[in-house]
């Protein structure tokens, strides 16, 4: 698989989807445009009702856009029914046939396409090896675990060698440990097959773990597209910063913007250097975000000062919640060691040091 895909598998161009009529109209998608590259793992991420599943259904052909185009390698597929699109879908429910064996489930789609029996047998064997289920080929799907059923559903969807595989929150029914294992498995399958995966989820951890790029959606719009690092460390809008991980929001006076950076004077009077979000328009005041792990507590003077209000232990790290002298709230995430305690107590007066390149100015 190439490291840097050089062409688009899917292009969504100014797509809108309206449900209802008259005063009851609801815009599930509002002039959405996005390009998804060949061979990449692309995730549509957002809360319930943001439009991510609607967009996936339009790409699959289960519904049709009210306006706009959906291109597959340059061909407009928006008017085509699902069976005429080289696209397969894995659903949350898996939709396996319980009376069939694992092998028969995997080969079902190939049979419907009228493939020769010898080709089906060879392809099923290849898929069983890919998902590491050769030993369970003759077992009925009702007799295997949830994680194994997930692998069968993936193998069945991959068997016809679609150009694009759509995955509609397929891990949501699994327990935490199995879900983590399947995240690694999905990424492995995508890498080994080289097929473009489009994954829908509301789970930020899933998106950050598996994706080459992520599109964050809200209210029928795509707010930001970027790598997991871009989305987490360089959020463009408040919704993105707030939805992905834990974030501190600070009000600052802005000056000297240029070359993607600016000076932000916080309410404490301290001026720090911050990066600016793409599309930021220079203005007097703006919102600055700092991730909790990018700040450090000190018992001396810092860029900010305040009082420790609460300390929450999470095993791998501790979250220390501080009420700033400015009235704003701030959380510092401190990685734990085997020594007892985090070094601070409730009521302590503390300073907060903001690391270099730790602050980002939002565009909204």
Swiss-Prot record:
EC number, UniProt record: 7.6.2.11
Positions of ATP binding: 46-53
Annotated keywords: ATP-binding, Cell inner membrane, Cell membrane, Membrane, Nucleotide-binding, Translocase, Transport
Molecular function terms, GO-annotated: ABC-type putrescine transporter activity; ATP binding; ATP hydrolysis activity
Residue ranges occupied by any ABC transporter domain in the UniProt entry: 10-244
GO cellular component: ATP-binding cassette (ABC) transporter complex
Superkingdom to which the source organism belongs: Bacteria
UniProt membrane topology term: Peripheral membrane protein
Subunit structure: The complex is composed of two ATP-binding proteins (PotA), two transmembrane proteins (PotB and PotC) and a solute-binding protein (PotD).
Biological role stated in the UniProt entry: Part of the ABC transporter complex PotABCD involved in spermidine/putrescine import. Responsible for energy coupling to the transport system.
Name of the protein in its database record: Spermidine/putrescine import ATP-binding protein PotA
Species for this entry: Mesorhizobium japonicum (strain LMG 29417 / CECT 9101 / MAFF 303099) (Mesorhizobium loti (strain MAFF 303099))
Gene giving rise to this polypeptide: potA
């Amino acid at each position: 698989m190439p490291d840097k895909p050089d062409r688009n598998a899917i292009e969504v161009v100014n797509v809108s989807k309206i449900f209802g009529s008259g005063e009851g109209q609801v815009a599930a998608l509002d002039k959405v445009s996005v390009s998804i590259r060949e061979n990449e793992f692309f995730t549509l991420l957002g809360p319930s009702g943001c439009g991510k599943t609607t967009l996936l259904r339009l790409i699959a052909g289960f519904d049709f856009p009210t306006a706009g185009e959906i291109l597959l390698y340059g061909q407009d597929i928006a008017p085509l029914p699902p069976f005429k699109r080289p696209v397969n879908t894995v659903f949350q429910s898996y939709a396996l046939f319980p009376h069939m064996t694992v092998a028969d489930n995997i080969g079902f789609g190939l049979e419907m396409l009228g493939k020769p029996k010898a080709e089906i047998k060879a392809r099923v064997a290849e898929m069983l090896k890919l998902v590491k289920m050769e030993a369970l080929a003759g077992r009925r799907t009702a007799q295997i675990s949830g994680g194994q059923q997930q692998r069968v559903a993936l193998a069945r969807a991959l068997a016809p060698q679609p150009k694009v595989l759509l995955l509609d929150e397929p891990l949501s029914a699994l327990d935490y440990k199995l879900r983590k294992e399947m995240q690694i498995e999905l990424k492995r399958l995508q890498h080994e097959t080289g097929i473009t995966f489009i994954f829908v989820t509301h789970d930020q951890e899933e998106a950050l773990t598996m994706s080459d790029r992520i599109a964050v959606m809200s209210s029928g719009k795509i707010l930001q597209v970027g790598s997991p690092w871009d989305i987490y460390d360089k959020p463009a809008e408040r919704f993105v910063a707030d939805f992905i991980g834990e974030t501190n929001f600070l009000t600052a006076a802005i000056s000297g913007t240029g070359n993607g950076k600016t000076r932000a004077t916080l309410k404490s009077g301290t001026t720090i250097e911050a990066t600016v979000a793409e599309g930021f328009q220079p203005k007097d005041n703006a919102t600055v975000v700092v991730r909790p792990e990018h700040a450090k507590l000190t018992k001396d003077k810092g860029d900010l000062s305040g009082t420790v209000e609460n300390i929450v232990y999470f095993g791998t790290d501790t979250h220390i919640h501080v009420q700033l002298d400015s009235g704003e709230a701030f959380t510092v995430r401190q990685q734990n060691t085997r020594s007892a305690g985090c070094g601070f107590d409730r009521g302590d007066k503390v300073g907060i040091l903001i690391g270099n390149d730790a602050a980002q100015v939002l565009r909204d």
